[in-house]
């Protein structure tokens, strides 16, 4: 846990401080008082009765002693339970395909008042310009949008072609920005463990802030070494004992439930009264359809309570206070005097039914957020422009030659997990000995004119058609999977024509496509419109076979080399356990 940074009263002047104290003493009038409310006590359990008194952005007082205190406005909570605003400990807003402005509109009314964001998706495409845009969005947001400075751009040096670099010098220029809380996930964990100086330089430069980790399945001496380097947390754990061991060794555990990686059921049994200060909730990657239909962090809290019997105060603790403490955001995470007035009023605390949200001391109106979204997006000066530097392709670009009797490597998908298995299949004149094998290709889109890297994919469930996307972690080249080279080419050419996006092809025709004009990653449509388009894409994709729940998000991780076991980048097949390229044909 890193408490070396403290943003408490970071933006408060001495005059504002004096006004806050005057209201706390009862010598001045509050801006708001929330009456008829019970406050969930995250520290001791149980509830605290009495009003919540607000002056400016901060809570001036809590409890029955303020029952008769004067206020400019009073809010009748109608018996609601008040909890601190929810915090997502680790996410990439770009993976929602929404801009930061649209993301705020979609999630703030659900109680998500704070996010800790790593914008490495757009930084991989556009470099520092992408980070600068996220910083501009964070500066103007009502939501507390904090940034971790992207540490691995690209994810792994020499393994893929991406659109830009993000040097240590550029990273340092953002280190002292008021919205920056630390260094984002250090994905090259073998490099850290082996003591590569370039990586240690980054860790040293941000050591006074929070150092995010990324080490799926790591254990033994390697895990000890990774933690010894100063890494403080991990969001990639997917096994119970893996999570327990990381907690034992002093790591904080981010329990992730995204649209593709779903680890909450595996890790929730770890949460208890003792270790909950070291446990946090995060989504990493969650799409707009799920946000609209199921929720965001509110959905995770609901499942902890309903499915895993986590006590109320512990469930809400890991959704707020634990994360605030971990990142040194000591002005957040509790409903207490001097804390920022980020408050969620719940008509039903067990079902996480949000009645009203206040952030920075002001009530949130969802309709007003929506009405101002377009103007706020324009004010942020989004980095528009076509980032696809790739000529149209033909079916011959995906031609692979196979020899009967030979064995070939297959990327074997595990539905709703980011890890894959490395399997193999024997080819004969009748095809492969597995009927679930289809083709996968990755095409770099940054003007290097490389031939497509091609491979085999199993377990995805694609029986016909093709899917293509420019959302392809972390370099965001074009990834396509399909049963025929002709349909793969059609899908790729559609996303090239769109300037980036997602596409479903079946029966030789484009069935559905979604343009993503910002970096080939994000739409400028409203959250509702985007959710409807995602729904149409998923419906079209389901016609291609029994695919994963979120086929495009699952497909996006098939090219990420820092998650085992077998992946495909623009450079070829990559063994994520040996951290080395391998061949399509099995020769050993």
Curated annotation (Swiss-Prot):
Keyword annotations of the record: Hydrolase, Manganese
Statement: the UniProt record of this protein carries the keyword Transcription: no
Cofactor(s) listed in the protein's UniProt record: Mn(2+)
EC number, as in UniProt: 3.5.4.2
CDD domains from the UniProt entry: AdeC
Gene Ontology molecular function, alphabetical: adenine deaminase activity
Pfam family, one: Amidohydro_1
GO biological process, one term: adenine catabolic process
Keyword Hydrolase part of the UniProt annotation: yes
Annotated catalysed reactions: adenine + H2O + H(+) = hypoxanthine + NH4(+)
Family annotation (SUPFAM superfamilies): Composite domain of metallo-dependent hydrolases, Metallo-dependent hydrolases
Gene3D superfamilies, sorted: Metal-dependent hydrolases, Urease, subunit C, domain 1
Subunit structure: Homodimer.
Cross-referenced NCBIfam families: ade, PRK10027.1
Sequence similarity: Belongs to the metallo-dependent hydrolases superfamily. Adenine deaminase family.
HAMAP family: Adenine_deamin (MF_01518)
Name of the molecule in the record: Adenine deaminase
Organism this protein belongs to: Escherichia coli O7:K1 (strain IAI39 / ExPEC)
Lineage: Bacteria, Pseudomonadati, Pseudomonadota, Gammaproteobacteria, Enterobacterales
Gene this protein is translated from: ade
């Amino acid at each position: 846990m890193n408490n070396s940074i403290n943003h408490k009263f970071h933006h408060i002047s001495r005059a504002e401080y004096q006004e806050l104290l005057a209201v706390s003493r009862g010598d001045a009038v509050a801006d708001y008082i929330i009456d008829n409310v019970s406050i969930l006590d995250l520290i001791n359990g149980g509830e605290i009765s009495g009003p919540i008194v607000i002056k400016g952005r901060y809570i001036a007082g809590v409890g029955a002693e303020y029952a008769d205190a004067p206020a400019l406005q009073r809010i009748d909570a109608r018996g609601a339970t008040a909890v601190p605003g929810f915090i997502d400990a680790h996410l990439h807003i770009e993976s929602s395909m929404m801009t930061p402005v649209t993301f705020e509109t979609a999630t703030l009314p659900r109680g998500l008042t704070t996010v800790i964001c790593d914008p490495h998706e757009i930084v991989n495409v556009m470099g520092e310009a992408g980070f600068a845009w996220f910083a501009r969005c964070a500066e103007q947001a009502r939501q507390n949008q904090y940034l971790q400075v992207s540490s691995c751009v690209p994810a792994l040096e020499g393994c893929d072609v991406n659109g830009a670099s993000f040097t240590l010098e550029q990273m340092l220029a953002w280190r002292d920005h008021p919205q920056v809380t630390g260094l984002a996930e250090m994905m090259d964990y073998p490099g850290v463990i082996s003591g590569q100086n370039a990586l240690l330089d980054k860790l040293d430069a941000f050591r006074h802030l929070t150092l995010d980790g990324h080490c799926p399945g790591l254990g033994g001496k390697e895990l000890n070494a990774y933690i010894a380097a100063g890494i403080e947390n991990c969001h990639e754990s997917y096994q119970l004992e893996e999570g327990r061991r990381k907690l034992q060794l002093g790591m904080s555990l981010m329990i992730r439930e995204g649209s593709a990686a779903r680890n909450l059921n595996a890790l929730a049994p770890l949460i208890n009264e003792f270790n909950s200060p070291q446990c946090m909730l995060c989504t990493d990657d969650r799409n707009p359809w799920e946000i609209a239909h199921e929720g965001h962090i509110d959905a995770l809290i609901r499942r902890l309570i309903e499915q895993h019997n986590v006590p109320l105060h512990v469930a809400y603790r890991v959704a707020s206070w634990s994360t605030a403490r971990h990142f040194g955001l000591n002005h957040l995470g509790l409903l207490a005097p001097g804390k920022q007035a980020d408050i969620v009023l719940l008509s039903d605390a067990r079902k996480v039914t949000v009645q009203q949200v206040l952030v920075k001391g002001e009530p949130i109106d969802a309709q007003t957020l929506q009405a101002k979204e377009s103007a706020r997006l324009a004010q942020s000066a989004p980095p528009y422009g076509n980032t696809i530097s790739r000529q149209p392709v033909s079916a011959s670009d995906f031609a692979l030659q196979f020899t009967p009797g030979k064995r070939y490597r297959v990327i074997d998908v595990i539905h709703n997990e980011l890890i894959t298995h490395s399997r193999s299949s024997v080819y004969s004149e009748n095809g492969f000995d597995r009927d679930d094998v289809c083709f996968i290709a990755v095409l770099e889109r940054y003007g290097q004119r490389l031939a497509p890297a091609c491979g085999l994919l199993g377990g995805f469930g694609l029986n016909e058609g093709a899917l293509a996307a420019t959302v392809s972690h972390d370099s965001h080249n074009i990834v396509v999977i399909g049963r025929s080279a002709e349909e793969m080419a059609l899908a790729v050419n559609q996303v090239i024509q769109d300037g980036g996006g997602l596409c479903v092809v079946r029966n030789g025709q484009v069935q559905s496509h979604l343009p993503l004009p910002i970096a080939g990653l994000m739409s400028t449509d409203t959250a509702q419109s985007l959710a409807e388009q995602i729904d149409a894409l998923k419906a079209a994709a389901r016609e291609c076979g029994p695919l994963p729940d979120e086929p495009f998000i699952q497909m996006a991780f098939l090219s990420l080399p820092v998650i085992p076991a077998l992946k495909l980048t623009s450079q070829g097949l990559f063994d994520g356990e040996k951290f080395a390229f391998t061949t399509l044909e099995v020769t050993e």
